[in-house]
Amino acid sequence: MDHSQCLVTIYAAAVLLGLRLQQGSCQHYLHIRPAPSDNLPLVDLIEHPDPIFDPKEKDLNETLLRSLMGGHFDPNFMAMSLPEDRLGVDDLAELDLLLRQRPSGAMPGEIKGLEFYDGLQPGKKHRLSKKLRRKLQMWLWSQTFCPVLYTWNDLGSRFWPRYVKVGSCYSKRSCSVPEGMVCKPAKSVHLTILRWRCQRRGGQRCTWIPIQYPIIAECKCSC
């Protein structure tokens, strides 16, 4: 490790230990299927287990369903068959590490506005060079950055498109020093998809209806 990298590590540790971070307990949530991402409000769906209420092959006409979706169909987040580039649960830790190496978006103001001083020598206090300051800021940002991790979710045959890309926040690592804070959902958006709905009044009648399906759009480090 060269002298510059060593200084970055020392200063970063000192800065993080000096930050005032609130700690809090984490609450776990029980989901019913199909479950939107993490702890966002669940879609109020009651699914009867009897396969008689499943759509038949004639009800899965892609041309017709596409027309019902209109401009709501988003190929980046929806698919009729399971995409080959899907990620498993075991891949999330690796993806989280990869995305944190190059944080996206704008650098948080509380990190961008930090000033660093060389106070290692008693009685002396000098502002660090711009290059070293930038390295420290990037290091802090990578440690506290909470990327959204996207995976494909199978909603079952009663939803179209059947596969939706949902977001999650990786909470198996702490995003603070001292440890205690984790990445949690901070913002959500809604996708419009179709749900196969059956009613028994006056004989069984089934049709596709549009529903709003929430997915995580932003994660933040919090208690």
From Swiss-Prot:
* Glycosylation sites recorded in the entry for this protein: 61
The stated induction of this gene product is:
By sonic ectopic hedgehog.
Q: What is its main location?
A: secreted
Give the signal peptide range: 1-26
Subunit architecture: Homodimer.
Membership in a protein family: Belongs to the noggin family.
The protein here is known as Noggin
Organism, as annotated? Gallus gallus
> Encoded by which gene?
NOG
